[in-house]
């Protein structure tokens, strides 16, 4: 008679901020390969991965994700935006695991300083400011409304920095052209001989993403979806970088006017409408949103701009100092999903 394979199950519970980092380190001290069933959200996955890969040893990690966190972007990106009243939608990854379906690889980003790992987003400017300030509001507003309150404080916050987009061997930096609906070499931008592309601020929005959405219906990077059309779909070792620079507007406007006339339509008629912002253009057909694809980037804040030094790595707020360097990694991480 066949016997079921022996499976050792260990249950852990995190108790404080960064508790999953300590848990990941403890697991890494004993195993080189494991399957982790995570009851949490993006922050828990982020912390767990940081702990698991805190040393230089290669590991093979599989994740079964049960989305019960504040932010569940990774789950919704892989399993769809369903948030029906029936909680069964939360069990898709677990069902895929129990049915022995193949797990899908994750693209991780490493953000320095700090060797932080992200499976969803590394951001600066607006998104980073919202995440930073929302923490101060958590006690008074424990629900998602604190993010809206924080956003209202920063809709007119332009940050000053220089962005350098990095190519990889065989994968040059590219930019989406809404006129042709394709990615191409960014010929109109300043280049270095090694293929780096230089973008000057000020910036209002700057997110590097390996998934398409940050909320079930909020889709800043639609081409990072595994279901995006094949010619537009993000390759495995790339990140999609979404940028809004206010001074690209043909007629100069104040931060208040830009927020009401440009940013709000981009957010609510674009990002909240399944990513339609990628095709929005000014009158002379200049894209409002710059949608880059790269293997990494360097972010260099202006010395006198404290907000520009704020970096968000899957919800963890980091002061990046004089420079942040972010690249995709080769870590072997898979998630079970249908």
Give residue spans per PLM region.
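ATP/NTP phosphate-donor binding region
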Residues: 1-39, 44-46, 50-57, 83
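Short amphipathic alpha-helical segments
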Residues: 49-52, 76-78, 219-220
């Amino acid at each position: 008679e066949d016997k079921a394979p022996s499976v050792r199950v260990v249950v852990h519970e995190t108790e404080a901020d960064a508790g999953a980092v300590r848990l990941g380190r403890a697991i890494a001290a004993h195993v080189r390969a494991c399957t982790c069933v995570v009851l949490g959200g993006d922050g828990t996955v982020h912390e767990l991965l940081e702990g698991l890969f805190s040393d230089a040893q290669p590991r093979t990690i599989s994740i079964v994700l049960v989305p019960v966190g504040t932010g569940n972007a990774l789950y919704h990106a892989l399993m769809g935006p369903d948030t029906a009243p029936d909680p069964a939608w939360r069990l898709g990854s677990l069902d895929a695991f129990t049915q022995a379906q193949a797990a899908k690889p994750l693209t991780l980003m490493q953000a320095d300083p700090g060797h932080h790992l992200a499976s969803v987003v590394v951001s600066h400017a607006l998104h980073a400011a919202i995440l930073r300030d929302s923490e101060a509001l958590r006690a008074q507003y424990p629900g998602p409304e604190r993010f809206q309150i924080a956003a209202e404080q920063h809709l007119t916050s332009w940050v000053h920095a220089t962005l350098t987009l990095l190519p990889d061997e065989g994968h040059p930096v590219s930019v989406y052209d809404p006129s042709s609906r394709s990615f191409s070499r960014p010929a109109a931008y300043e280049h270095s001989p090694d293929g780096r592309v230089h973008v000057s601020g000020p910036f209002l929005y700057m997110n590097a993403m390996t998934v398409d959405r940050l909320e079930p219906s909020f889709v800043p990077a639609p081409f990072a979806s595994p279901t995006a059309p094949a010619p537009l779909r993000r390759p495995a070792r790339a990140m999609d970088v979404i940028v809004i620079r206010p001074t690209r507007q043909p007629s100069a406007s104040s931060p208040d006017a830009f927020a009401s006339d440009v940013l709000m339509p981009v957010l609510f008629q674009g990002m909240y409408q399944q990513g339609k912002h990628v095709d929005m253009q000014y009158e002379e057909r200049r894209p409002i949103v710059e949608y880059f694809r790269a293997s990494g980037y360097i972010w260099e804040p202006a010395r006198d701009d404290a907000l520009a030094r704020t970096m968000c790595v899957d919800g963890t707020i980091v002061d990046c100092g004089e420079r942040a360097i972010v690249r995709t990694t080769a870590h072997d991480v898979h998630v079970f999903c249908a």
